[in-house]
C-alpha cells in the first residue's frame, strides 16, 4: 500500500483570500493549452494573431468552466442544487462534469467559429490535442482534494484517503491517478502524434471522442460512483459510463465519415 501524500487543498492563504490547488490546476491546464496552441498556430492559420488565439482560449475556457459546472448540476446532483442554488457557485469545492464542459466547449467553438470564419470542426480539430493537458491537471486537482477515489482493493499501490474524505478508511484504487495517466498523458500522446500530419477534417475530433470515451469507461469500473446516484443500471453502469457511450459511438462515426466522404481540404493542426 502506498501512503497518500497529505497536501493541503489550499495552495496559498493570504488572510481571508484562499487559493486552492483545484483552481490552480485549471489555470495550469489553460496556460499549457495556450502555449502548445501557439506552437501550432501557423500551421492552423498563418493569418491568426496571438491575440485571436487568446480570445479563442478564453471563450473555450469559459465553456469548460460554465459547462462543466452546469453539467455536474444537471447530470449528477440536480436535487441538491435546486434546494440550495448558491452552492452552484462554490466551484472550488469540486463538482465539475467533463461531459458538461465538453458541451460547453462545443457551444463556444460553434459561436467563435461563426464570428471568425472558421468551421466548427476546424476549431475542434485544432483544440482536441490540447484538451488532455487540462484533463490531466484537473485529475491532479481531484487527487489533492481527495475526491473521486476508487473502490476498495488490495493492489500494492492502493491508498487510504483522509478521514474527512473516506470515513471508512479503506485502501482504495487511486482512480484519479489512473485518469491522469489515461485521459491526460496517454490521450495527449495519441492525439499529439496523430495530429502531427494533416488529417481529414473531423478525424482528430473523432479520435478524441473515441479514446476519451474508452479510457473513461474503463476507469469507471474501479471508481466509486457519486453517492447520490450510485449505479444507474445493471448493478454496474455509472452515469460517467452512460455519458461516454455517445462519445464512443460519435467518435467512431466521425472517423469513418472523415475518411469516407468526398475528398476535401485536409485539417492541419
Swiss-Prot record:
Is Cell inner membrane among this UniProt entry's keywords?
yes
Subcellular location(s): the record lists: Cell inner membrane
Main localisation: membrane
What EC number(s) does the entry state? 2.5.1.145
* Pathway recorded for this protein: Protein modification; lipoprotein biosynthesis (diacylglyceryl transfer)
Going by the UniProt record, its keywords in alphabetical order are: Cell inner membrane, Cell membrane, Membrane, Transferase, Transmembrane, Transmembrane helix
* Membrane topology designation: Multi-pass membrane protein
Q: Give binding positions for a 1,2-diacyl-sn-glycero-3-phospho-(1'-sn-glycerol).
A: 139
Q: Which InterPro entries match?
A: Lgt
**NCBIfam families for the chain:** lgt
Task: Relate the protein's function as given in its record.
Answer: Catalyzes the transfer of the diacylglyceryl group from phosphatidylglycerol to the sulfhydryl group of the N-terminal cysteine of a prolipoprotein, the first step in the formation of mature lipoproteins.
Q: What is this protein called?
A: Phosphatidylglycerol--prolipoprotein diacylglyceryl transferase
Gene transcribed to yield this protein: lgt
Amino acid at each position: 500500500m502506498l501512503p497518500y501524500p497529505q497536501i493541503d487543498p489550499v495552495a496559498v492563504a493570504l488572510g481571508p483570500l484562499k487559493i486552492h490547488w483545484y483552481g490552480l490546476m485549471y489555470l495550469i491546464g489553460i496556460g499549457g493549452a495556450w502555449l502548445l496552441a501557439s506552437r501550432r498556430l501557423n500551421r492552423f492559420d498563418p493569418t491568426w494573431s496571438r491575440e485571436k488565439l487568446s480570445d479563442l482560449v478564453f471563450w473555450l475556457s469559459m465553456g469548460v468552466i460554465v459547462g462543466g459546472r452546469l453539467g455536474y448540476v444537471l447530470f449528477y446532483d440536480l436535487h441538491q442544487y435546486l434546494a440550495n442554488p448558491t452552492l452552484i457557485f462554490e466551484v472550488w469545492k469540486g463538482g465539475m462534469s467533463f461531459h458538461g464542459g465538453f458541451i460547453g466547449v462545443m457551444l463556444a467553438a460553434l459561436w467563435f467559429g461563426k464570428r471568425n470564419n472558421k468551421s466548427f470542426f476546424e476549431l475542434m480539430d485544432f483544440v482536441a490535442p490540447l484538451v488532455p493537458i487540462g484533463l490531466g491537471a484537473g485529475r491532479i486537482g481531484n487527487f489533492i482534494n481527495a475526491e473521486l477515489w476508487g473502490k476498495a482493493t488490495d493492489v500494492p499501490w492502493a491508498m487510504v484517503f483522509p478521514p474527512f474524505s473516506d470515513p471508512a478508511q479503506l485502501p482504495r484504487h487511486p482512480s484519479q491517478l489512473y485518469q491522469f495517466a489515461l485521459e491526460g498523458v496517454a490521450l495527449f500522446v495519441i492525439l499529439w502524434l496523430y495530429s502531427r500530419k494533416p488529417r481529414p477534417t473531423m478525424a482528430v475530433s473523432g479520435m478524441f471522442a473515441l479514446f476519451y470515451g474508452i479510457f473513461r469507461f474503463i476507469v469507471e469500473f474501479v471508481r466509486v460512483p457519486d453517492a447520490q446516484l450510485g449505479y444507474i443500471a445493471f448493478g454496474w453502469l455509472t452515469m460517467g459510463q452512460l455519458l461516454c457511450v455517445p462519445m464512443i459511438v460519435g467518435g467512431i462515426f466521425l472517423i469513418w465519415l472523415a475518411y469516407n466522404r468526398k475528398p476535401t481540404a485536409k485539417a492541419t493542426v
